[in-house]
Protein backbone atom coordinates (compact mmCIF):
# COMPACT_ATOMS: atom_id res chain seq x y z
CA UNK A 1 0.00 0.00 0.00
CA UNK A 2 1.34 3.43 -0.98
CA UNK A 3 1.19 6.31 1.49
CA UNK A 4 3.02 9.12 -0.32
CA UNK A 5 4.00 9.76 -3.94
CA UNK A 6 6.22 12.57 -5.23
CA UNK A 7 5.63 12.75 -8.99
CA UNK A 8 8.32 14.78 -10.80
CA UNK A 9 8.31 17.44 -8.10
CA UNK A 10 10.40 20.59 -8.45
CA UNK A 11 10.74 23.41 -5.95
CA UNK A 12 12.19 26.69 -7.19
CA UNK A 13 12.49 30.20 -5.79
CA UNK A 14 13.03 32.37 -8.86
CA UNK A 15 16.27 31.15 -10.45
CA UNK A 16 17.22 29.14 -7.37
CA UNK A 17 16.33 25.47 -7.82
CA UNK A 18 16.06 23.70 -4.46
CA UNK A 19 14.64 20.32 -5.48
CA UNK A 20 14.88 18.87 -8.96
CA UNK A 21 12.50 16.30 -10.48
CA UNK A 22 11.86 14.30 -7.34
CA UNK A 23 10.25 10.93 -8.11
CA UNK A 24 9.66 8.99 -4.93
CA UNK A 25 7.14 6.44 -3.71
CA UNK A 26 6.89 5.88 0.05
CA UNK A 27 5.06 2.77 1.22
CA UNK A 28 2.61 2.93 4.10
CA UNK A 29 4.09 2.03 7.51
CA UNK A 30 7.65 2.65 6.29
CA UNK A 31 10.24 4.67 8.22
CA UNK A 32 12.05 6.92 5.75
CA UNK A 33 15.26 8.64 6.85
CA UNK A 34 16.49 11.64 4.83
CA UNK A 35 20.19 12.55 4.97
CA UNK A 36 22.36 15.13 3.23
CA UNK A 37 24.48 18.24 3.85
CA UNK A 38 22.94 21.48 5.08
CA UNK A 39 21.11 23.46 2.41
CA UNK A 40 20.45 20.53 0.08
CA UNK A 41 16.65 20.61 0.41
CA UNK A 42 15.77 18.11 3.16
CA UNK A 43 13.72 20.56 5.21
CA UNK A 44 12.11 21.95 2.05
CA UNK A 45 11.05 18.39 1.21
CA UNK A 46 9.50 18.09 4.67
CA UNK A 47 7.78 21.48 4.34
CA UNK A 48 6.25 20.31 1.07
CA UNK A 49 4.87 17.25 2.84
CA UNK A 50 3.55 19.36 5.69
CA UNK A 51 1.78 21.69 3.26
CA UNK A 52 3.76 24.79 4.23
CA UNK A 53 5.23 24.96 0.72
CA UNK A 54 3.79 24.09 -2.69
CA UNK A 55 5.67 22.40 -5.54
CA UNK A 56 6.65 24.66 -8.41
CA UNK A 57 6.05 21.74 -10.73
CA UNK A 58 4.83 18.18 -10.30
CA UNK A 59 2.41 16.81 -7.74
CA UNK A 60 2.33 15.14 -4.35
CA UNK A 61 -0.22 12.45 -3.54
CA UNK A 62 -1.12 11.13 -0.10
CA UNK A 63 -3.24 7.99 -0.06
CA UNK A 64 -3.81 8.41 -3.79
CA UNK A 65 -5.25 11.92 -3.40
CA UNK A 66 -3.64 15.34 -3.91
CA UNK A 67 -1.92 16.62 -0.78
CA UNK A 68 -4.13 19.03 1.15
CA UNK A 69 -2.85 22.59 1.12
CA UNK A 70 -3.10 23.04 4.88
CA UNK A 71 -1.64 20.77 7.59
CA UNK A 72 -4.33 18.51 9.02
CA UNK A 73 -4.82 15.75 11.58
CA UNK A 74 -3.30 13.20 9.18
CA UNK A 75 0.14 14.81 9.54
CA UNK A 76 1.95 15.19 12.84
CA UNK A 77 5.29 16.98 13.11
CA UNK A 78 8.14 17.22 15.63
CA UNK A 79 10.88 19.83 15.17
CA UNK A 80 14.44 19.96 16.51
CA UNK A 81 13.52 22.65 19.01
CA UNK A 82 10.71 21.66 21.28
CA UNK A 83 7.50 22.93 19.68
CA UNK A 84 5.43 23.07 22.86
CA UNK A 85 3.33 25.84 24.40
CA UNK A 86 5.33 27.29 27.32
CA UNK A 87 2.27 28.84 29.00
CA UNK A 88 0.34 25.54 29.17
CA UNK A 89 0.88 22.60 31.49
CA UNK A 90 2.15 19.30 30.13
CA UNK A 91 -1.38 17.86 30.19
CA UNK A 92 -2.89 20.93 28.53
CA UNK A 93 -0.21 20.81 25.81
CA UNK A 94 -1.40 17.35 24.80
CA UNK A 95 -5.11 18.11 25.13
CA UNK A 96 -5.19 21.36 23.19
CA UNK A 97 -5.11 19.84 19.70
CA UNK A 98 -8.11 17.62 20.36
CA UNK A 99 -9.97 20.45 22.07
CA UNK A 100 -9.56 22.77 19.09
CA UNK A 101 -10.58 19.93 16.79
CA UNK A 102 -13.83 19.13 18.62
CA UNK A 103 -14.89 22.46 20.11
CA UNK A 104 -16.50 25.41 18.37
CA UNK A 105 -16.42 27.53 21.55
CA UNK A 106 -12.95 29.08 21.86
CA UNK A 107 -11.23 25.70 21.76
CA UNK A 108 -12.68 24.56 25.08
CA UNK A 109 -14.62 21.40 25.90
CA UNK A 110 -16.69 20.63 28.96
CA UNK A 111 -18.24 17.67 30.71
CA UNK A 112 -17.93 14.12 29.40
CA UNK A 113 -16.13 15.05 26.17
CA UNK A 114 -13.43 16.92 28.07
CA UNK A 115 -12.99 14.03 30.53
CA UNK A 116 -12.61 11.59 27.65
CA UNK A 117 -9.91 13.72 26.00
CA UNK A 118 -8.15 14.21 29.33
CA UNK A 119 -8.13 10.45 29.94
CA UNK A 120 -6.61 9.87 26.49
CA UNK A 121 -3.99 12.55 27.10
CA UNK A 122 -3.00 11.06 30.45
CA UNK A 123 -2.70 7.62 28.88
CA UNK A 124 -0.50 9.05 26.11
CA UNK A 125 1.74 10.88 28.59
CA UNK A 126 2.22 7.63 30.47
CA UNK A 127 3.13 5.91 27.18
CA UNK A 128 5.87 8.47 26.44
CA UNK A 129 7.27 8.36 29.98
CA UNK A 130 5.78 11.59 31.38
CA UNK A 131 3.41 10.17 33.96
CA UNK A 132 3.60 12.31 37.10
CA UNK A 133 4.54 15.46 35.18
CA UNK A 134 1.05 16.42 34.00
CA UNK A 135 0.82 19.61 36.07
CA UNK A 136 4.31 20.92 35.29
CA UNK A 137 5.11 23.58 32.71
CA UNK A 138 7.58 22.86 29.87
CA UNK A 139 10.26 25.08 31.42
CA UNK A 140 10.45 22.63 34.33
CA UNK A 141 11.22 19.71 31.99
CA UNK A 142 14.59 18.56 30.66
CA UNK A 143 15.30 18.65 26.93
CA UNK A 144 14.54 14.97 26.52
CA UNK A 145 11.27 15.31 28.43
CA UNK A 146 10.22 18.28 26.29
CA UNK A 147 10.86 16.22 23.17
CA UNK A 148 8.75 13.41 24.63
CA UNK A 149 6.00 15.98 25.15
CA UNK A 150 6.35 17.17 21.54
CA UNK A 151 5.97 13.56 20.39
CA UNK A 152 2.84 13.14 22.50
CA UNK A 153 1.42 16.30 20.92
CA UNK A 154 2.23 15.06 17.42
CA UNK A 155 0.55 11.65 17.76
CA UNK A 156 -2.40 12.70 19.93
CA UNK A 157 -4.63 13.29 16.92
CA UNK A 158 -3.71 9.87 15.53
CA UNK A 159 -1.95 11.02 12.34
CA UNK A 160 -1.17 8.67 9.48
CA UNK A 161 2.12 10.44 8.74
CA UNK A 162 4.68 11.58 11.31
CA UNK A 163 7.27 14.13 10.15
CA UNK A 164 10.45 14.51 12.20
CA UNK A 165 12.76 17.45 11.42
CA UNK A 166 16.06 16.65 13.17
CA UNK A 167 14.13 15.79 16.34
CA UNK A 168 17.18 14.59 18.28
CA UNK A 169 19.73 17.25 17.29
CA UNK A 170 19.53 19.18 20.56
CA UNK A 171 19.76 16.11 22.82
CA UNK A 172 22.83 14.53 24.38
CA UNK A 173 23.75 10.97 23.28
CA UNK A 174 22.26 9.17 26.28
CA UNK A 175 18.90 10.90 25.96
CA UNK A 176 18.94 10.41 22.18
CA UNK A 177 19.25 6.66 22.66
CA UNK A 178 16.21 6.66 24.96
CA UNK A 179 14.16 8.71 22.47
CA UNK A 180 15.23 6.37 19.66
CA UNK A 181 13.67 3.48 21.57
CA UNK A 182 10.51 5.52 22.14
CA UNK A 183 10.22 6.51 18.46
CA UNK A 184 10.59 2.90 17.33
CA UNK A 185 7.95 1.79 19.82
CA UNK A 186 5.53 4.51 18.72
CA UNK A 187 6.11 3.55 15.08
CA UNK A 188 5.62 -0.15 15.77
CA UNK A 189 2.46 0.32 17.85
CA UNK A 190 0.68 2.78 15.56
CA UNK A 191 -0.35 2.84 11.91
CA UNK A 192 2.31 5.42 11.09
CA UNK A 193 4.43 6.31 8.10
CA UNK A 194 7.47 8.20 9.41
CA UNK A 195 9.63 10.65 7.44
CA UNK A 196 12.67 11.82 9.40
CA UNK A 197 15.38 14.36 8.54
CA UNK A 198 18.72 13.75 10.25
CA UNK A 199 22.41 14.63 9.89
CA UNK A 200 23.44 11.49 11.77
CA UNK A 201 24.05 8.58 9.38
CA UNK A 202 24.18 5.94 12.09
CA UNK A 203 20.83 7.24 13.37
CA UNK A 204 19.38 7.07 9.86
CA UNK A 205 20.38 3.43 9.40
CA UNK A 206 19.44 2.49 12.96
CA UNK A 207 15.89 3.84 12.75
CA UNK A 208 14.97 3.91 9.07
CA UNK A 209 13.64 1.12 6.90
CA UNK A 210 14.89 3.20 3.94
CA UNK A 211 17.57 5.88 3.71
CA UNK A 212 17.35 8.56 1.03
CA UNK A 213 20.33 10.85 0.39
CA UNK A 214 19.96 14.42 -0.90
CA UNK A 215 22.99 15.70 -2.78
CA UNK A 216 24.06 18.23 -5.41
CA UNK A 217 26.84 16.22 -7.09
CA UNK A 218 27.38 18.55 -10.08
CA UNK A 219 30.39 20.84 -9.88
CA UNK A 220 29.60 23.82 -12.08
CA UNK A 221 30.23 26.98 -10.01
CA UNK A 222 28.97 29.23 -12.79
CA UNK A 223 25.55 27.52 -12.65
CA UNK A 224 25.33 26.77 -8.95
CA UNK A 225 21.74 27.95 -8.53
CA UNK A 226 20.47 26.28 -11.70
CA UNK A 227 20.52 22.79 -10.29
CA UNK A 228 18.44 21.53 -7.42
CA UNK A 229 19.12 18.58 -5.18
CA UNK A 230 18.45 15.13 -6.54
CA UNK A 231 17.83 12.10 -4.38
CA UNK A 232 18.95 8.51 -4.38
CA UNK A 233 18.46 5.48 -2.21
CA UNK A 234 21.67 4.42 -0.50
CA UNK A 235 22.74 1.55 1.72
CA UNK A 236 25.33 1.40 4.47
CA UNK A 237 27.29 -1.07 2.36
CA UNK A 238 27.42 1.36 -0.57
CA UNK A 239 28.76 4.16 1.62
CA UNK A 240 31.47 1.99 3.12
CA UNK A 241 32.42 0.61 -0.30
CA UNK A 242 32.65 4.12 -1.79
CA UNK A 243 34.57 5.73 1.03
CA UNK A 244 36.11 3.08 3.25
CA UNK A 245 34.66 4.98 6.22
CA UNK A 246 32.44 3.94 9.07
CA UNK A 247 28.83 5.15 8.95
CA UNK A 248 29.13 6.21 12.58
CA UNK A 249 30.85 9.41 11.41
CA UNK A 250 28.78 12.58 11.32
CA UNK A 251 27.39 13.42 7.89
CA UNK A 252 28.51 17.04 7.92
CA UNK A 253 32.14 15.95 8.28
CA UNK A 254 32.11 13.94 5.08
CA UNK A 255 29.19 14.86 2.77
CA UNK A 256 31.03 13.74 -0.37
CA UNK A 257 31.08 10.14 0.79
CA UNK A 258 27.34 9.94 0.24
CA UNK A 259 27.82 11.47 -3.22
CA UNK A 260 30.39 8.78 -4.06
CA UNK A 261 27.78 6.14 -3.31
CA UNK A 262 25.17 7.74 -5.61
CA UNK A 263 24.89 7.78 -9.41
CA UNK A 264 26.38 10.84 -11.15
CA UNK A 265 23.50 12.79 -12.77
CA UNK A 266 25.88 14.56 -15.20
CA UNK A 267 26.86 11.21 -16.69
CA UNK A 268 23.22 10.67 -17.67
CA UNK A 269 21.63 13.85 -19.10
CA UNK A 270 18.34 11.99 -19.49
CA UNK A 271 18.33 10.86 -15.86
CA UNK A 272 17.88 13.64 -13.32
CA UNK A 273 17.29 11.39 -10.37
CA UNK A 274 18.32 7.99 -9.13
CA UNK A 275 15.23 5.72 -9.13
CA UNK A 276 14.07 4.94 -5.61
CA UNK A 277 11.20 2.56 -6.22
CA UNK A 278 13.13 -0.39 -7.55
CA UNK A 279 12.74 0.62 -11.22
CA UNK A 280 15.68 0.48 -13.59
CA UNK A 281 16.94 3.71 -15.20
CA UNK A 282 15.73 4.32 -18.76
CA UNK A 283 18.04 3.50 -21.63
Regions found by a protein language model. Give the residues of each.
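Conserved ABC ATPase signature
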Residues: 137-141, 145
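A short, proline-enriched helix->beta-strand linker immediately N-terminal to the Walker B motif
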Residues: 156-160
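Catalytic Walker B motif of ABC-type/P-loop ATPase nucleotide-binding domains
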Residues: 162-165
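Conserved ABC transporter NBD signature motif
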Residues: 58-70
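Conserved ABC ATPase "signature" region
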Residues: 95, 107-133, 185
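The feature captures the beta-strand-to-loop junction immediately N-terminal to the Walker
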Residues: 35-37
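Helix-to-loop junction immediately C-terminal to a conserved catalytic motif
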Residues: 50
Amino acid sequence: MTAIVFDKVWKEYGDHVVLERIDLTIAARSFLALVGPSGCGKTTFLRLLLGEEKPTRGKILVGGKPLKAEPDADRGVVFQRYSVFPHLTVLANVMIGREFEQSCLMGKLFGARRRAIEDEARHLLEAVGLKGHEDKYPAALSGGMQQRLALAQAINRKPKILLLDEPFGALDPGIRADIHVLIRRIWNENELTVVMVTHDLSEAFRLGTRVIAFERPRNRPEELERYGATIGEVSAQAIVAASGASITQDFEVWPRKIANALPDPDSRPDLKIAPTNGAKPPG
